[in-house]
Amino acid sequence: MKIWKSILFTTLLSCGAVAAPVELDKVAVIVNDGVILQSDINTAMKTLQANARQSGKSLPSASVLKEQVVEKLIIDTLQGQEADRIGVRIDDNRLNQAIAEIARNNNQSVEELAASVQAEGLSYPEFREQIRKEIAASEARNALVRRRINILPAEVDSLADQLAKETNATVQYKIGHIQLRFTDGQDKSEVEAQAKALVKKLNDGADFTEMAYTYSKGPKALQGGDWGWMRKEEMPTIFADQIKMQNKGSIIGPFRSGVGFHILKIEDVKGLETVAVTEVNARHILIKPTVILSDEGAKKQLNEFVRRIKAGEATFAQLASQYSQDPGSAAQDGELGYQTPDLYVPEFKHQVETLPVGSISEPFKTVHGWHIVEVLDRRQVDRTDSAMKNKAYRILFNRKFNEEAGAWMQELRASAFVEIVDDNNDN
């Protein structure tokens, strides 16, 4: 069945609007201050039976089927009432987007979708309005259920650790190792100081293999500290305890064991999915238009700042500190620190993403006022740990949402006034 047909079926369940004339209608169910008509039930029953015949599927007895259909219509009515109660409104733009998405999912144009709907006996305007109601009901349910969900940081951390372990189980690491041993009577703080000095040299670019040949007393010293490829479960415990999904090139340590201090290098990684983001360090000057200072005046003032900076008459830092109307960054000479561009408003984000390092922008306007910005630096930052926690949060949210949505609907049903006016099986 095409996607739109499944939506059409839901629509028929909810509104029972068909082109064929209906005999004298009557109220079948009262739901709070709303009603479900007998024609709604009859149409839904006939639609289900027709779909079952086309697909070769069997259905329960008419009485059981009717009971299920009525219950579905009651729940739909209650959710629609909740949407009205909290004031959810779906405008035409949002509705048009949803209709276009339904058409795309069925490889149709909107016009073709409308023709298909009408061919099934439902007027297209009624179809549109029912989709509007369904979106509103869905948004109301989402908003009301979210309020019931509480996710503790400890839950996120625990699941993130579990996910990391599962991911790490298949990851292979090529490990380099330097061991500095304790000797009898030696001050252990001296060994620690030596290890820290080696780590500094390694972080400054010293060759790990050469350092291992020179200083290591470990079992792989004669191989330049190379332990080859290993999964965590194959490593010595003191290694495995330190490996936490670090990237290729990471220097780990120094860390202590009973025999001395150790330094590891992750020479390479296989099978690890990492998440890296670009952070930008920028500084800016903000001038806010007022009843006295027009947009043109603010822009002119910033252009004068750019001229003075380029002429060497003043520095960006001096002007930001003296004139910027962003008090937080003005106190830091205009610097915003390393941030991901997504944190900024769109116009500012575009500037910090596209400006070369060391360049100053032309004056531009955002909701905050007029700016000039200079990009000081860019860097790649590993956000694998944050991504894992975000994934854990989404999993927990989805689990709890499904649980709470079921509980919410049961409570909604239990607290509603529902009266079956006519329980005769007309089918």
Curated annotation (Swiss-Prot):
It catalyses: [protein]-peptidylproline (omega=180) = [protein]-peptidylproline (omega=0). It comes from the Bacteria. HAMAP family: Chaperone_SurA (MF_01183). Chaperone involved in the correct folding and assembly of outer membrane proteins. Recognizes specific patterns of aromatic residues and the orientation of their side chains, which are found more frequently in integral outer membrane proteins. May act in both early periplasmic and late outer membrane-associated steps of protein maturation. The PPIase activity resides only in the second parvulin domain. The N-terminal region and the C-terminal tail are necessary and sufficient for the chaperone activity of SurA. The PPIase activity is dispensable for SurA to function as a chaperone. The N-terminal region and the C-terminal tail are also required for porin recognition. It is an enzyme of class 5 (isomerase). Pfam families: Rotamase_3, SurA_N. Coiled coil: none annotated. This is Chaperone SurA. It comes from Vibrio parahaemolyticus serotype O3:K6 (strain RIMD 2210633). Residues 170-268, 277-377 form the PpiC domain.
